[in-house]
């Protein structure tokens, strides 16, 4: 037994910041101080506060160190681990307070979180099955195989109110019930780990931090619907997640928790990985299954739905990583426990990848019904620089932008749809007053155009026509009639596209038109971008009262658009200016501004 455990984040974010070097140095320094028998080092999954990595927590006291560098390790070992003195300069300091905070659970970022899907992330070594078992892992599978009938498992999920965490929010128990009712010689369980939304990394972090939870849930699903084979479709761009899944599958087979006659129950179930190439459309369930089959990842018309004809034309259920991660806890704690969290129609918790113009970025897991204001102002620590909140974008390219007037709306599936957005997989991007909403709509539409598989004409052609109109607007070349044309195209796409990619592609455009129409009008009528983002509508000018005639801006300008002699007020020639902004960045006197 160790007297202290040092947990170091080994997720993708902290690994890219050098956490493996920190672990190596930590083990070396601990050995040098003769503490190898007293202090254990554990590489965990993601803690959540990704912007503060590399992150380290020392237990049993729970001291939370952020932005740790390799050179800090000797001091941490000598002072904290040897002498018991906290290294205060490395403690986390919240933006709303001046005091440094020692325990992680006292930070505003964690106070309002309730971890179910992320319960083991940042807590256990994801590459050690015994640590997972030590936290109650595979208990749910044992209960199911020894005490429950398949229909009992499905009823538990129905009673819990669990809805799919990958987008539409379809009741998980109902999906399983449909698949179980269809007779077939083979059925399949698929896990969608093809997380494609820009800025979303919830599923990746669960796979990196708690892969066995997903394997256990898939085995439970196999028992419930009568399947013996599972597939995890994970993108190849997630090398750490892939590696840990491979380790977890091998360990589960070794322990008899995957394979033949699990728990001597006569139940057989195994899991294989399939690596995706990163196509966004392969997040759509029928396209994902087509890709697993070895064909080009294109959606198929529905019906028939996968519960009847899915993978290899056999009954199939497909859930995403976060959905599966909830299931073992529901089995162990009971459906009433899960249903006690959340709102009337949206039970449990939801993991969000919080990003954008916010002080605390990273993963947050909150009960359904938490307001956007609580996320932004308390968990997220507010907007940097004291700037105003303008909008939040949820649901990735399929979602919409939520304005400040809806900050107090409880977040759940139905409320988000009612205000023109959607839950999606859980991306949550915060925008401040310097964000152009027309440019945001254009950004997501550019993504959709690139990721469209091209199978159906409305999506293939319609998204391109919409993008062309948005480009005209951001360049000041549009007319008011273009807005009517844009809305008409949006409505056509929503009703005639083959799959959800095309059907939801108009959402960012429609939501910004609904709440920020005046910005579109300013671009079209006034030929101005109120946020100062759209390059073609910007005009750089020099304030004669502030200009010192230092010539630094003129020497920086790549287009020789700035004229003026030494110690004389300079001017910008708008005909030659390429609007790169280099002069504004270089000016030391704040004399250059844009309008």
How would you name each of these model-derived features?
Residues 14, 137, 157-179, 278-290, ...:
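Conserved phosphate/anionic-ligand binding catalytic regions in large, soluble enzymes, centered on
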Residues 112-113, 242-368, 380:
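Hydrophobic alpha-helical positions that pack around
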Residues 142-183, 339-340, 345, 353, ...:
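Accessory "access/gating" subregions that flank catalytic or transport cores
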Residues 217-219, 369-384:
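Short amphipathic, charge-patterned alpha-helical segments
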Residues 52-56, 458-464, 552-571, 582-595:
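Iron-sulfur cluster-binding cysteine motifs and their immediate structural context
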Residues 2-5, 19-43, 60-89, 140-157, ...:
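Ferredoxin-type iron-sulfur electron-transfer modules in oxidoreductases and energy-metabolism complexes
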Residues 91-160, 313, 319-334:
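Flexible inter-domain linker/hinge segments
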Residues 348-360, 366, 372, 530-578, ...:
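C-terminal accessory/binding modules appended to enzymatic or scaffolding proteins
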